[in-house]
């Protein structure tokens, strides 16, 4: 179990919907500090969070997840003055706009990766940090394809690939930063928006999604925090229909294990086995 007591948590997302409900639950876990980084100021939401736990320090910054990494570095230098250190980084910024592929990819994937690359040095044990946990909040259509929201699905598949890659022991054993993801199923705040399909053939299905059964943002937020508390490095969870399920991960490339051994080995025989395909 991952104990959130006394932790310094940084949440990159819009402070509404899933992010707000997740933050409400976090505030009941006796965290010491919560940094909320979002695109639009939402003081009523911040006040609502503060009312849950007065002793927890809450800091707010207006943040554009699509900014260049160089700008992010300057930004987080200021954030760290208030936070001192970050134990948990939660990436929850999301956009589903099939008519604006660049914005969808930049928000959901590129921006998230730049945020991680910027924050990791502050957490890295070999760079003076204390280790910690990175949580990427993503979607179930990052596990299974969506014929309706093709660009959104592609961006979320990228989040899963990035999460699994960064969770490799090659990194974790050195920097002490665990990486996990929570894939949210259809949630009310998402289906309430105007949604456009990637191609017009799918628009009927996009319109029907408004009436489809979906979980509440409160239920999803609760399960995101539960997944964090149960987390181990590299785990992928599904938060859907009020439940929580851990994903069984698979290696589809039959030489993946040999490739990793080859990367880590200086033995000529092992390298020859990889090239020849022998086990």
UniProtKB/Swiss-Prot annotation:
Gene behind this protein: Adhr
Protein name: Alcohol dehydrogenase-related 31 kDa protein
Top-level taxon: Eukaryota
Regions crossing the membrane: none
Keywords: Oxidoreductase
PANTHER family attached to this UniProt entry: 15-HYDROXYPROSTAGLANDIN DEHYDROGENASE [NAD(+)], ALCOHOL DEHYDROGENASE-RELATED
Residues where substrate binds: 139
SUPFAM superfamilies: NAD(P)-binding Rossmann-fold domains (SSF51735)
Record: active site: 152
Matching Pfam families: adh_short (PF00106)
GO terms under cellular component: cytoplasm
Family indicated by similarity: Belongs to the short-chain dehydrogenases/reductases (SDR) family.
GO molecular function terms listed in the Swiss-Prot or TrEMBL record: oxidoreductase activity
UniProt keyword Nucleotide-binding present: no
Binding site for NAD(+): 11-34
Entry keyword annotation includes Methyltransferase: no
């Amino acid at each position: 179990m991952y104990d959130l007591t006394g932790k310094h948590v940084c949440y990159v997302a819009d402070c509404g919907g899933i992010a707000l409900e997740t933050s409400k639950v976090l505030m009941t876990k006796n965290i010491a500090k919560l940094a909320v980084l979002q695109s639009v100021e939402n003081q009523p939401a911040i006040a609502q969070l503060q009312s849950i736990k007065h002793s927890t320090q809450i800091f707010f910054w207006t943040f554009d997840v699509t900014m260049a990494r160089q700008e992010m570095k300057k930004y987080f230098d200021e954030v760290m003055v208030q936070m001192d250190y970050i134990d948990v980084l939660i990436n929850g910024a999301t956009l589903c706009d099939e008519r604006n592929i660049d914005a969808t990819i930049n928000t959901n994937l590129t921006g998230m990766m730049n945020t991680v690359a910027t924050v990791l040095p502050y957490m890295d044990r070999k760079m003076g940090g204390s280790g910690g946990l990175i949580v990427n909040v993503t979607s179930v259509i990052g596990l299974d394809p969506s014929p309706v929201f093709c660009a959104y699905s592609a961006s979320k598949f990228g989040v899963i690939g990035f999460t699994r890659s960064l969770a490799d022991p090659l990194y974790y054993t050195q920097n002490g930063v665990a990486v996990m993801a929570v894939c949210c199923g259809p949630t009310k705040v998402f289906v309430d928006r105007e949604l456009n399909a990637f191609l017009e053939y799918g628009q009927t299905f996009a319109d029907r999604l408004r009436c489809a059964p979906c979980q509440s943002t409160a239920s999803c937020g609760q399960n995101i925090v539960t997944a964090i508390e149960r987390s181990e490095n590299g785990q992928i969870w599904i938060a859907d229909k009020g439940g929580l399920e851990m994903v069984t991960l698979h290696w589809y490339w039959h030489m993946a294990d040999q490739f990793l051994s080859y990367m880590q080995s200086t033995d000529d025989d092992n390298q020859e086995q990889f090239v020849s395909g022998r086990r």
